[in-house]
Amino acid sequence: MRRSINDRSLIVSVNPTSTISEVYRLLRTKIHYLSKDHESKLIMVTSALAGEGKTTTICNLATTYALEGKKVLLIDADLRKPSLHRIFSLPNNHGLSTLLSGGTSAHSAIQETMVGYLSLLPSGPVPMNPSELIDSTAMRELLESLKQDYDVILIDTPPVLAVTDPVITSTLCDGVVMVVATGRVKKDHLRKAKEQLEHVNARMLGIVLNRMNREDQQIFYMDDYGTKG
């Protein structure tokens, strides 16, 4: 059964003609352009620190792909502080954690959202060993299998500087997008996050500079990560 969504977080769904919704569509186009020479079917969205807007970004980005008619799967790989199930008003009894530990099947864990063509694999209950689950053969096999069923898979992770999970996840993805809250994150934080991802040869698609306007809506600018100091 499909349920309601968080109007504030999913502006692309509730107000697709708004200026901010158009900016999210431009972000989707930019990602497509930056990955045109290399298939980017499995994309991770992360940030250096918490509270930079990565989760709102990935939810709206996923929605733009779905509204384009792409079959999209959104994965909540933040096994420590999950949030995507709340945005889509869906249960979190089963999800990625139970799937990787053998407690459920992908068919049972993946849920439909109110957005057509957009499905969600929530995090599931917080496990005792999140890093071990992410860095497992089961995770690798799961993602390879899911790539056969979806046009686009977007993965939300914890902040890079918080835990090792996103660095591990980046090695399993075709590309990584970093969300940066301008005026909040220091250059040293961004540099350290970049170095950690580059150390494992993560393929950086670009950074999204997240700013706030008078209505507290997010505005984005995306550039090739390599152009940033």
Model segments located where?
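P-loop NTP-binding module
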Residues: 1-229
